[in-house]
């Protein structure tokens, strides 16, 4: 976590659907709270307004802010409102239905009328890659650049703005999955690409696939929000790094949250 200046103001901001709350803590222990109306859809404007108001009320200047901490439910809202990025999935041949197969567990075992929620990536945007990582870590047949290029062309035609990559047994060969993801980034500039092993190189194809899909689904939304918020804070005179609260209670630089940890930002978020 980036270091903060102790002899300066520390500001914490939390955004809700109705109000945006900011608390400024001075170097002398003084606390200045501020509440303003939230500003959807540009919620960052409310954060900047509340921060500026709190610091001004304290008789300080934005340049005296030594730490800027932020909790946000932008990713949660994108999932609940089905307002995330159009996402594609790249997986091993024969495994594109893993999102729908899931696990045996279901929330209402005896409810005959229960319907499984539709996956965030429909079947038409799930692409199968030839090649296979086996249980011993060997790759046979290999994932060729030609096959990756073929899938990239299909993804480009689907209109997807984000891509999740999850290959079977990739936790044994993280380098192989990352290579495929890097090739897709090169072939699909401007798309948000997630490799499942970058979130958790662990066994469990359904868990890794669904987590990578959620990360890609909300990633562009979170990235755009945090980029705009950082820009507006700097314009207002707050130049310290923006730190975002994670589901584990820790803080992460906003640049890393937007890049590869979108699905775990904010304290009320849990991996899906």
PLM features: residue spans?
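N-terminally biased helix-coil "hinge/interface" segments that flank
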Residues: 2-272
């Amino acid at each position: 976590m980036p270091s903060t200046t102790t002899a300066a103001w520390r500001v914490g901001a939390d955004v809700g659907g109705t109000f945006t709350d900011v608390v400024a803590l001075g170097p002398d222990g003084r606390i200045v709270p501020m509440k303003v109306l939230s500003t959807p859809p540009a919620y960052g404007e409310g954060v900047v307004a509340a921060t500026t108001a709190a610091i001004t009320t304290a008789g300080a200047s934005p340049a005296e802010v030594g730490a800027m901490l932020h909790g946000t439910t932008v990713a949660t809202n994108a999932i609940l409102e089905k307002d995330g990025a159009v996402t594609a999935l790249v997986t091993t041949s024969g495994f594109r239905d893993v999102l729908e197969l899931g696990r045996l567990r279901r929330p209402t075992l005896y409810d005959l009328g229960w319907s499984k929620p539709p996956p965030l990536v429909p079947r038409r945007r799930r692409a199968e890659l030839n090649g296979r990582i086996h249980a011993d870590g060997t790759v046979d047949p290999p994932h060729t650049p030609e096959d990756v290029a073929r899938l990239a062309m299909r993804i480009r035609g689907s209109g997807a703005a984000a891509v999740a990559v999850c290959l079977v047994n990739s936790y044994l060969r993280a380098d192989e999955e990352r290579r495929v993801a890097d090739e897709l980034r090169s072939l699909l500039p401007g798309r948000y690409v997630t490799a499942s092993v970058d979130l958790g190189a662990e066994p469990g194809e359904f868990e890794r696939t669904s987590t990578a899909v959620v990360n890609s689904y909300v990633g562009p939304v979170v990235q755009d929000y945090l980029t705009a918020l950082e820009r507006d804070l700097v314009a207002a005179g707050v130049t310290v790094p923006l730190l975002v609260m994670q589901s584990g209670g820790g803080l992460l630089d906003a640049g890393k949250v937007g890049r590869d940890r979108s699905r775990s930002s904010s304290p009320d978020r849990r991996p899906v």
